[in-house]
Amino acid sequence: PGPREHVRRIVRRWGDPDGDGDPSDGVDGWRLDVAEMVGHGFWREFRGWVREVNPEAYIVGEVWWQDWPNNKMFDAEPWLRGDQFDAVMNYRFAAAVKAFFLDRRSAIAPSELDRRLARVRADYRPEVAPVLMNLLDSHDTDRLASQAVNPDTLHDHRVSARERPDYDVR
């Protein structure tokens, strides 16, 4: 089979391992890495395959950097119209919380934290905001403890001992 059929079989295998039509023994959801690098058409098809097996499965996409060098994150709304993902990993939340609670020189005021979080809520349909995958760190970012002792860095920019000899890994 081609790649599409291979992925469809994976969805069936993990969504209903014994193939009895009852997805209770399968996975409850899917986290899709670097999802912005795959076309919207494929994700629409993927959602259909998932819903065929388990209409209640949670689909979360990692839609992150639109322009990493300039610290611009995607507005993930195009993936969240009800035909692709249920949610995305909310790195915009993580960056705002880091700036408010951990940064020192570049700390933001409570009003700015409120503005940033309100912007995230406003960018998505009302039913999407409550199910976004809010996170403070991940396998792609430095650990929260490392962020705390290395304040005032851009989220996911030059945050490792390899890139900065003075970086304190926790």
What does each model-identified segment do?
Residues 3, 132-135:
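Hydrophobic side chains within well-formed alpha-helices
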Residues 1-8:
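Chitinase-like catalytic core of GlcNAc-active glycosidases
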Residues 134, 139-142:
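Extended catalytic-interface subdomain
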Residues 9-12, 19-132, 151, 157-161:
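Active-site-proximal helices and loops of the catalytic beta/alpha 8
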Residues 1, 162-170:
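Short, intrinsically disordered, charge-balanced linker/junction segments flanking boundaries
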Residues 141-152:
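Short, solvent-exposed beta-strand-terminating loops
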